[in-house]
């Protein structure tokens, strides 16, 4: 099933505009859709007690680029209690470019929002001052409207840049307005800047490529072992499906 034919392209899914912007902009850079195994590309399921079963939909969509992107994938979830857009670009390791990471999660009582250029090396080895200044300026503008969430633990924070947008909003009308306006604007600014940098980057030497491979593998292994979405996914789709999704699709190249 094409992602365009699913509920995730319809206005009643909270993140539909974000997903459309991703798909359209990656196509402008001649990215090619990557075939996802059918059991992960679209899934309908139910969760909850026998007396109050709820429907949940999941779709996984991905692309590659012959030179620049190993794998870029979006995971979309829709249900009465949860609405999720998780997106990750894993760049080719011949370029010294961080990951692009999005995690927008609507829970029963709150929205958790993360947007960043996520490092695969130490910050000083992957970001020049110009990029950091641009990111921090965009971040500060976003957080002039969106509250900054509590400080991340050191173990988690090492996988984020100084430009990370990290917010927690209550489920209320004001939050819907902030998501549809300020967050959407910031999301477009971050993605546009990221793709510009990725597609203008020059190839690096073999030693640095090895460091980038190790850095990416460290992050992907950390996510496989510690993915915070695991409990939610397990409650919606069961443990067996969740483990195979995480290990075979979400954090692999």
Curated annotation (Swiss-Prot):
Alphabetical UniProt keywords: Oxidoreductase
Alphabetical GO biological process terms: phytochromobilin biosynthetic process
Enzyme Commission identifier(s): 1.3.7.3
EC supergroup of this enzyme: oxidoreductase
Transcription keyword on record: no
Gene designation per UniProt: pebB
Record flagged with keyword Oxidoreductase: yes
Database matches in HAMAP family: PebB
PANTHER family to which the protein is assigned, alphabetical: PHYTOCHROMOBILIN:FERREDOXIN OXIDOREDUCTASE, CHLOROPLASTIC
Coiled coil location: none
Protein family according to the UniProt entry: Belongs to the HY2 family.
Reactions catalysed: (3Z)-phycoerythrobilin + oxidized 2[4Fe-4S]-[ferredoxin] = 15,16-dihydrobiliverdin + reduced 2[4Fe-4S]-[ferredoxin] + 2 H(+)
GO MF annotation list: cobalt ion binding; phycoerythrobilin:ferredoxin oxidoreductase activity
Name listed for the protein in its UniProt record: Phycoerythrobilin:ferredoxin oxidoreductase
Task of the protein: Catalyzes the two-electron reduction of the C2 and C3(1) diene system of 15,16-dihydrobiliverdin.
Lineage: superkingdom: Bacteria
């Amino acid at each position: 099933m094409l992602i365009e034919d699913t509920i995730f392209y319809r206005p009643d899914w909270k993140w539909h505009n974000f997903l459309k912007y991703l798909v359209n902009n990656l196509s402008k850079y001649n990215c090619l859709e990557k075939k996802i195994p059918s059991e992960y590309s679209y899934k309908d399921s139910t969760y909850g007690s026998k007396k109050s079963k709820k429907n949940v939909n999941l779709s996984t969509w991905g692309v590659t680029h012959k030179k620049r992107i190993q794998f870029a994938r979006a995971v979309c979830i829709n249900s009465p209690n949860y609405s999720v857009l998780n997106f990750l670009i894993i760049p080719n390791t011949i370029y010294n470019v961080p990951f692009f990471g999005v995690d927008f999660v609507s829970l029963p009582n709150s929205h958790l929002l993360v947007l960043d250029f996520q490092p695969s090396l130490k910050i000083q080895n992957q970001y020049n001052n110009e990029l950091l200044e641009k990111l921090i300026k965009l971040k500060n503008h976003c957080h002039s409207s969106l509250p900054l969430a509590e400080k991340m633990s050191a173990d988690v924070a090492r996988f984020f840049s100084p430009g990370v947008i990290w917010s927690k909003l209550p489920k209320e009308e004001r939050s819907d307005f902030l998501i549809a306006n300020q967050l959407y604007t910031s999301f477009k600014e971050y993605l546009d800047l990221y793709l510009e940098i990725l597609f203008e980057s020059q190839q690096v030497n073999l030693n640095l490529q090895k460091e980038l491979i190790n850095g990416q593998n460290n992050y992907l292994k950390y996510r496989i072992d510690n993915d915070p979405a695991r409990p939610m996914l397990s409650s919606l789709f069961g443990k067996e499906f969740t483990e195979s999704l995480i290990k075979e699709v979400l954090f692999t190249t």
